[in-house]
């Protein structure tokens, strides 16, 4: 038995309520279960109950065993003086408030319908199952599934946004620096995200600004600092780039880092050198990107409207040697979608949270709804159960639902699990 199950039993009133009695035999009528408290203190606040015709308003605390009241030292905590009811699975002790008065106890172990317990056991069954509630997913009302998707999509965006805000704070609340570093981290994918971030951190964005965002200097700095202009690895056509890098590295006193690039078992388009080239082509236009992000009427297409990146003669040789680019960096559809999903939308959300402006968050949600879904094993699993997955908003939500709830069996926190437990009761 877990406490989160008892929380759900209380919140949805899934226990037997007719002629309800407390552990001491007193009559109990529940008028309001109260509001879940996500901070310290009792589990539910502003509950309203009637005990032996006397109305009480206050807090409700929930434990598996009554003795946990003492394990958590609630008897000496003033915050629990307001508790009017102790809801437990098993009453193994009497409990008292700070002032010495007894706390009424509702014991649930003999008050739960058998069908509710069987459904709970099915959800918590340790047998391997892709989704614990898969046997009844077909019966979930569409409005409930939609509501859960909207909730977890917001949770996913906000979680990513808070990571960006941590970086923003470490960068002295510099949005442009944070934009640049987050872009690099995103382009590195999971396999090279950290080396890409370290690369960006080793060349502050103010250096590019002082160089007027010059195309050749941006490429030389990033490729050289990444270790891709070493003498033994470049041809004669790229010596000019190395010379430029060495001059700029000395001028700005850049510290060299041995970046641990992972190169094995990855697709050519994900090779570190290719990802650094993409980063350089975007840093070259970074001021425009950042300005577009904060414009009210900006659309995702605005960021990729410039067409293929056209290299200068100095860069042509290098690009020619780094297949599959062969002289140009194009905005491939999957790259556009990936940047909108994993970079632009979370960054918009971060700005919205920091400025307390929901318009940015709404824009992020709209952009995700305008992008195609990304196919993966999780989205294929959900579609096998009959759920449509046509946009990135849906695929991101279903990924979050699976990884954040299904895998960790957070069924009691999920509206699908609570529907399963409560149906017909």
Model regions: which residues?
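Intrinsically disordered, low-complexity linker/loop segments enriched in Gly/Pro
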Residues: 127-170
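Aromatic- and glycine-enriched beta-alpha-beta binding-site module
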Residues: 56-94
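N-terminal ordered "arm"
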Residues: 8-67, 80
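Compact, glycine/acidic-enriched structural inserts
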Residues: 83, 87-145
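Low-complexity, highly charged intrinsically disordered N-terminal segments
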Residues: 1-8
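Cysteine-cluster motifs in flexible loop/terminal segments that predominantly coordinate metals
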Residues: 396-425
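Hydrophobic, aromatic-lined core segments that form the binding pocket/scaffold
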Residues: 152-397, 410
């Amino acid at each position: 038995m877990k406490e989160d199950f008892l929380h759900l039993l209380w919140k949805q009133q899934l226990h037997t309520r007719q002629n309800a009695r407390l552990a001491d035999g007193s009559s109990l009528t529940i008028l309001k279960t109260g509001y879940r408290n996500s901070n310290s203190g009792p589990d539910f606040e502003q509950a309203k109950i009637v005990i032996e015709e006397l109305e009480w308003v206050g807090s409700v605390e929930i434990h598996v065993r009554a003795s946990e009241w003492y394990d958590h030292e609630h008897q000496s905590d003033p915050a629990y003086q307001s508790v009017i009811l102790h809801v437990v699975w098993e009453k193994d002790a009497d409990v008292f408030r700070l002032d010495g008065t007894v706390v009424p106890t509702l014991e649930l172990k003999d008050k739960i319908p058998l069908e509710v317990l069987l459904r709970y056991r099915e959800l918590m069954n340790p047998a391997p199952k892709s989704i614990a509630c898969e046997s009844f997913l077909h019966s979930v009302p569409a409005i409930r599934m939609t509501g859960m998707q909207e909730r977890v999509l917001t949770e996913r965006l906000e979680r990513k946004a808070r990571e960006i805000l941590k970086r923003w704070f470490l960068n002295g609340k510099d949005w442009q620096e944070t934009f640049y570093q987050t872009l690099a981290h995103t382009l590195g994918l999971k396999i090279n995200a950290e080396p890409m971030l370290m690369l960006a951190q080793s060349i502050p964005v103010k250096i590019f600004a002082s160089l007027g965002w010059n195309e050749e200097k941006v490429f030389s700095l990033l490729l050289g600092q990444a270790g891709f202009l070493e003498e033994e690895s470049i041809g004669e056509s790229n010596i000019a780039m190395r010379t430029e890098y060495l001059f700029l590295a000395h001028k700005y006193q850049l510290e060299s880092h041995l970046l641990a690039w992972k190169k094995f078992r990855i697709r050519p388009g994900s090779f570190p050198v290719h990802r650094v080239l993409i980063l350089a082509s975007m840093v070259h236009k970074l001021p425009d990107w950042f300005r577009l992000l904060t414009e009210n009427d900006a659309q995702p297409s605005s960021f990729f409207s410039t067409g293929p990146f056209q290299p200068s003669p100095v860069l042509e040789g290098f690009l020619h040697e780094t297949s599959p680019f062969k002289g140009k960096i194009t905005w491939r559809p999957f790259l556009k979608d990936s940047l909108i999903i994993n970079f632009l939308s979370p960054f918009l959300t971060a700005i919205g949270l920091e400025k307390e402006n929901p318009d940015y968050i709404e824009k992020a949600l709209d952009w995700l709804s305008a992008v195609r879904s990304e196919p993966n094993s999780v989205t294929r699993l959900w579609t096998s159960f009959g759920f449509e997955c046509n946009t990135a908003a849906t695929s991101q939500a279903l990924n979050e639902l699976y990884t954040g709830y299904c895998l960790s069996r957070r069924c009691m926190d999920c509206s699908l699990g609570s529907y399963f437990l409560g149906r017909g009761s």
